[in-house]
Amino acid sequence: MDSKDGPEKIYPSGYEPKETNTDVNVRNQLLNEILKSSPTEFINTDLFTVMSKRRSTRKFADKIVETVKIDKIIAAADTAPTAGNFQGFEIFYVKSPEKKQQLVEACNNQPYVHAPVVLVFCKNPARVKLDLPEEILKKFAIQDATLAAAYSQLAAQALGLSSIWIGMFDEQKVMKIINTDLIPS
């Protein structure tokens, strides 16, 4: 898949959980590196202020978002609590205007998908390496993806960015657009 035209799976990259999760430092290396960097401006990092100011935005400025801010948003997703610390989710970053337009249509013509940064959070129960029935693993994966998305939205707010949660979409169409068999959450 050409990354210029299609979505790019950006998390996890090069990290696969093991049966036993003994080395938490492996997961935290990316986060630690990102936290060392700083965007051109930090807006607010007081958690309660961030939570109280976060709102759904339905109109976005057509401005490029700094890569370091996107990295911090993705790193925030990685800090969300997950079942067994296995991160049962994957994130797709949709950059292409054509793919964004297709997502608008897959999301019942909600125009908010034209935001400068579009992240699609998908559940991946195969990453949850627990000896439990499949329906429980699927439940854990959707919880993991949902928490990761929520943490990402809080990080975006802390960095002075707006966001919106889009929950009404055609799963099959979104899966085809981002070229995955994983179900978006």
Language-model region placement:
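Acidic, surface-exposed loops and disordered segments
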Residues: 1-185
